[in-house]
Every structure is written in structure tokens, then in C-alpha cells.
């Protein structure tokens, strides 16, 4: 778990086209491209100590709920061309991780639904945010820190640390049907863990709505737990 280690790992492979981006890989949050997890980062550093995967000493805990550590902030600042001053690993709204352009999925806030949507690269349509994956990528990528939008690896969706500071998986209100089925088994385990065994079937897909208003109506009809959480904004 993130609590059981003192070291995270960085990945800066994508700085050639997103020079201010630093990926922070933890035991419970893999790289946003989906290709690197914490064990990969450790192994790559041992093989190539001067490579793009460097150890990040967590240091003093600043906010455990949001996933903010003094050592991580220092590392990210020094390795983002001094552009990114803070990093909160478990929040979409406060100092989220930057994104390059290689993300498997994009998380975006849906204020009317009091939750977030996720879309994968393969989905060709327009999402309830009013944007396609490509449109969202132009907002999210490039190394800028954009509260409300973040790129992720799809397996992060089922992590106990997924948006833990913002309400976790209970905030997930819309995703493409194909993506839902692809990660259903993993999501179900997390839903069971938090005592919401029916959650996965309450998450809307393009079959239930493609506008934020339609999604909000669907959530109300099925009693999605996001509607009972405090306002996201």
C-alpha cells in the first residue's frame, strides 16, 4: 500500500513533449499510461539509476487524506521546471497530478451529477462533458495541472486510493459501456469493500445518457450514492 512504503517512483519518459509533467507512481496508483507500476519503477531504477524512473522519498506527511507529502512536492517542483508546486495524489480538484498525453483514460468532473466521468481512448463518441476523448485530451494533457481533469491508467479506477479525497469510487457516475465491462470485476471488488455492492450497475453509460442532464436523471432514478455526497464544487 501507499502507507507501507517510504519511497514512490517518478516517470519522466514523456517530458520530451510534456516538459513540465512528472508522473508519480505509487503502490496503489500506476502510471497514467498503464504501462508502469511501482514495482516496474523500482526495477527500472535498479537497472538504470540515471534513467527516467527515480525514487521519490515521501518525507513528512502534509495531508494523508489528499495524498500530499513534503518530499513528493519538492521532487515534483524540482523536476517540472519549477512549474508544479504541489501534488495531491488522491484529489481531482486540489493540486492533481499533471498529465502528458499517453493516458489510457481521462477523468472529468460533472458538476450537475455531483460526480466524475471517465472515458477511455477507444471511445469514439461525445461524453457528458460535451467533449470527445480528443477534446478532453487537449484540455488535460501537455503537462499542465488542470483541477477537475486528470489522465489515469484504467486499473487506477479500482484502487482504494482512486479520488479518495473526493469520495472515491462513489463519485464515478458515467463511463463507456465497453470500459465498464472491461474493468467490472475489479470495480466490483472495490464496491463490495466500501459497502456499495450495487454501485457498478448504477454507473451510467452512453446507453443511459450522453448529456450531463440525462446522466443526472438516470442517477436519480437508480439512487446513485454520488447524489448523497457533499457538493464537489
Q: Which ranges hold each PLM region?
A:
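Cysteine-centered metal-binding/redox modules
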Residues: 1-233
Amino acid at each position: 500500500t501507499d502507507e507501507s512504503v517510504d519511497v514512490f517512483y517518478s516517470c519522466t519518459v514523456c517530458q520530451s513533449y510534456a516538459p513540465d509533467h512528472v508522473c508519480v507512481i505509487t503502490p496503489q496508483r500506476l502510471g497514467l499510461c498503464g504501462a508502469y507500476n511501482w514495482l516496474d519503477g523500482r526495477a527500472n531504477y535498479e537497472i538504470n539509476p540515471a534513467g527516467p524512473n527515480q525514487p521519490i522519498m515521501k518525507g513528512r506527511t502534509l495531508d494523508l487524506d489528499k495524498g500530499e507529502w513534503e518530499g513528493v512536492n519538492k521532487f515534483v517542483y524540482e523536476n517540472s521546471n519549477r512549474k508544479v508546486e504541489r501534488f495531491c495524489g488522491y484529489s481531482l480538484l486540489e493540486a492533481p497530478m499533471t498529465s502528458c498525453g499517453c493516458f489510457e483514460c481521462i477523468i472529468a468532473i460533472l458538476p450537475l451529477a455531483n460526480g466524475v466521468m471517465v472515458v477511455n481512448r477507444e471511445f469514439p463518441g461525445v461524453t457528458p462533458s460535451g467533449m470527445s476523448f480528443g477534446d478532453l485530451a487537449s484540455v488535460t494533457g501537455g503537462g499542465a495541472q488542470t483541477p477537475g481533469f486528470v489522465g489515469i491508467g484504467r486499473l487506477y479506477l479500482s484502487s482504494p486510493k482512486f479520488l479518495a479525497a473526493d469520495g472515491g469510487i462513489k463519485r464515478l457516475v458515467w463511463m463507456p459501456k465497453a470500459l465498464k465491462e472491461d474493468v467490472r470485476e475489479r470495480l466490483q471488488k472495490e464496491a463490495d469493500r466500501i459497502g456499495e455492492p450495487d454501485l457498478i450497475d448504477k454507473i451510467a453509460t452512453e446507453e443511459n445518457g450522453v448529456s450531463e442532464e440525462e446522466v443526472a436523471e438516470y442517477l436519480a432514478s437508480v439512487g446513485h450514492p454520488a447524489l448523497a455526497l457533499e457538493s464537489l464544487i
